[in-house]
Amino acid sequence: MAFLYENMDFMRENGYTAELPAYIPENLNPNFELRPYQKMAFENFITHYESPRRPKPTQVLFHMATGSGKTLIMAGLMLYLYKQGYRNFLFFVNLSNIVEKTKENFLNAASSKYLYADEIVLDGERIHINQVDNFQYAERDAINICFATTQG
């Protein structure tokens, strides 16, 4: 069985990779310029997601160093997946302090580490981020995030 990165290398060499949609960087915080490897992570995910041969359910792992921008990539992928029809996202981590920092980054527009642009606009519609305790209270036209931790 081939590793995904081997398939991605083959696809890239043969011109099959997806481009980063403009709406992703346009809706992320302009203070966080995407680095080349982050753009590649987006392109790899989108290429894999759009492949008719991808396994379902789809599970991916971003193996990246601390401080490399994984959470920013997750914010951008939520935008991409929203456009694909997804509305509900579970952010699950092992430590309470990490989940609190993550909430701040996703929800507090006044934070210097806020991940999104001042306004999130997809296809001319303003989208907001909605924190939920469970998806029973999810909003139909929002990015609904349930933050959870194994620590309770």
Model-derived regions: residue spans:
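RecA-like P-loop NTPase motor core of helicase/translocase proteins
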Residues: 1-152
